């Protein structure tokens, strides 16, 4: 009942909220590029958001449920901020992206409250958490409805963990500039001693709660604990902004791991997804004595950040997401591209230098955000490296196999 009341109080009718696609302003007209990326999904001319079926299904959202929600959004006649984009319905009502995904989450939340078996309740809460997270996607700063969905996602996630066989600890990490940031420490079952730990550096469009399956199915069976933290400007890190020192948040966390009794701070590995790989690789150079291994998947460390052509061919949502993380809301295209180039680890003078930390770089052929050259650059920079090519078909099985190979590689390097 308390959770239902929280949902009602957060989403009660108010004045019109600013629609997500209008939060970042561009001086030049934008084109909705039609592209496909294995790790990020499809970008269609009729949708503002990228439709990321692979990752949503991997997070155990039923494919039919995904299509049902998308259909409800597409079929509405409600007012849109852009009549050409289906997911731009204004206000919290039927057809609005946050409304429809949150409505779906509430159905699972209700089932969780009525569940008679604890494992069943945990599974239902986790589904609710994932659906609330999708409701907030792509988590742009200033999106009030998205922020409300994130609150519910975190609440549902904590309820899921409370009902599961694993332990979830909320850890407060102190920041040099004052205040704290909250991370989730996931601990394996029957913990008897401090665990080797993987710090996940997530992609810019995901909450830290989106990686539970990575822990449950891949890391925990190998004896790992998993530590997550939200990327700057979203979730528990919403008041922070991404800077050219991309790893500053995660670096401060690494310096505090020796204070956490459940973590073996002498056995720490990193797993970086997309732009999270930028953070992980940067940390490998700056904290080489504290890190035993770094794995990356679809890394964004140089090519996309430096290529005007790649950026021009990228979906509008993706550019808006980067601008939002950097705290840019009125975009001058030329200045924005110059700013993105400053985040290249090669231009920063790091990538290309030999690094003592073992690194694995996984990639998909013809990835619009992370070409093979990106992963080769990472592999060539480490004295102990592996390049992992991931087949594009069958997409789900290949992704699952890659995660198992990467997890085993981390075990060999970290444990």
From Swiss-Prot:
It comes from the Bacteria. InterPro entries: AB_hydrolase_fold, FrsA, FrsA-like, FrsA_esterase. It catalyses: a carboxylic ester + H2O = an alcohol + a carboxylate + H(+). Gene3D superfamilies: alpha/beta hydrolase. Keywords: Hydrolase, Serine esterase. GO terms for molecular function: carboxylesterase activity. SUPFAM superfamilies: alpha/beta-Hydrolases. Residues 1-23 are annotated as: Disordered. It holds the Pfam family FrsA-like. Its EC number is 3.1.1.1. Transmembrane segments: none annotated. PANTHER family: DIENELACTONE HYDROLASE DOMAIN-CONTAINING PROTEIN-RELATED (PTHR22946), ESTERASE FRSA (PTHR22946:SF4). Catalyzes the hydrolysis of esters. Belongs to the FrsA family. This is Esterase FrsA. It comes from Photorhabdus laumondii subsp. laumondii (strain DSM 15139 / CIP 105565 / TT01) (Photorhabdus luminescens subsp. laumondii). The lineage of its organism: Bacteria, Pseudomonadati, Pseudomonadota, Gammaproteobacteria, Enterobacterales.
């Amino acid at each position: 009942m308390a959770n239902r009341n929280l949902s009602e109080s957060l989403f009660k009718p108010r004045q019109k909220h600013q629609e997500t696609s209008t939060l970042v302003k561009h001086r030049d007209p934008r084109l909705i590029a039609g592209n496909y990326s294995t790790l990020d999904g499809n970008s269609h001319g009729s949708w503002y958001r990228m439709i990321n079926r692979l990752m949503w299904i991997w997070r155990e959202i039923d494919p039919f449920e995904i299509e049902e929600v998308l259909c409800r959004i597409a079929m509405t006649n409600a007012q849109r901020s852009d009549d050409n984009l289906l997911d731009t319905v204004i206000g919290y009502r039927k057809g609005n992206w946050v409304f429809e995904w949150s409505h779906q989450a509430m159905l699972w939340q209700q089932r969780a409250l009525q569940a008679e078996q604890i494992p069943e309740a945990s599974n239902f809460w986790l589904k609710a958490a994932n659906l609330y997270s999708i409701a907030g996607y792509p988590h742009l700063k200033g999106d009030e409805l998205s922020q409300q969905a994130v609150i519910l996602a975190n609440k549902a996630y904590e309820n899921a963990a409370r009902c599961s066989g694993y332990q979830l600890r909320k850890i407060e990490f102190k920041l040099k500039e004052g205040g704290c940031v909250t991370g989730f420490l996931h601990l394996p079952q029957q913990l008897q001693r401090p665990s080797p730990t993987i710090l996940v550096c997530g992609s810019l469009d995901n909450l830290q709660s989106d990686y539970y399956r990575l822990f449950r199915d891949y890391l925990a069976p190998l004896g790992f604990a998993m530590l997550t933290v939200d990327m700057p400007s979203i979730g528990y890190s919403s008041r922070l902004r991404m800077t050219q020192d991309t790893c500053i948040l995660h670096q401060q966390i690494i310096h505090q791991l020796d204070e956490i009794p459940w973590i073996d701070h002498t056995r720490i590995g990193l797993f970086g997804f997309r732009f999270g790989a930028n953070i992980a690789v940067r940390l490998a150079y700056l904290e080489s004595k504290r890190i035993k291994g770094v794995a990356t998947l679809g890394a964004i460390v140089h090519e996309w950040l430096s290529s005007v052509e790649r950026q021009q061919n990228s979906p509008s949502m993706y550019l808006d997401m980067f601008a939002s993380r950097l705290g840019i809301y009125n975009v001058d295209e030329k200045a924005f591209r110059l700013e993105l180039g400053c985040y290249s680890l090669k231009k920063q003078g790091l990538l290309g230098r030999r690094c003592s930390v073992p690194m694995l770089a996984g990639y998909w052929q013809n990835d619009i955000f992370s070409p093979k050259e990106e992963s080769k650059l990472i592999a060539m920079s480490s004295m102990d490296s592996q390049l992992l090519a991931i087949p594009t078909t069958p997409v789900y099985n290949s992704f699952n196999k890659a995660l198992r190979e990467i997890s085993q590689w981390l075990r060999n390097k970290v444990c």
